[in-house]
């Protein structure tokens, strides 16, 4: 049981690392990107209006 939970945690961490870009791998943009709206983030996660995902 312990090994299974550890495996699940490892899989989750690997998924996060895969989706996260290293800052030095990003191509520099000419225009500064505005800070993302937290509501926009929930909107992208498709959690619906109840979670502040009003698009």
Curated annotation (Swiss-Prot):
Keywords: Behavior, Disulfide bond, Hydroxylation, Secreted, Signal. It comes from the Eukaryota. The keyword Signal applies. Disulfide bonds join 43-55. GO terms for cellular component: extracellular region. One of its GO terms (molecular function) is hormone activity. Coiled coil: none annotated. The modification Hydroxyproline is found at residues 28, 32, 34, 38. Its main location: secreted. One of its GO terms (biological process) is regulation of female receptivity, post-mating. Residues 1-19 form the signal peptide. Main cells of the accessory glands of males (paragonial gland). It is found in: Secreted. Represses female sexual receptivity and stimulates oviposition. This is Accessory gland-specific peptide 70A.
């Amino acid at each position: 049981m312990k090994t299974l939970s550890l495996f699940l945690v490892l899989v989750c961490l690997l998924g996060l690392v895969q989706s996260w870009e290293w800052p030095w791998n990003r191509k520099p943009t000419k225009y500064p990107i505005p800070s993302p709206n937290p509501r926009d983030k929930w909107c992208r996660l498709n959690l619906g209006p109840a979670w502040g995902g009003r698009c």
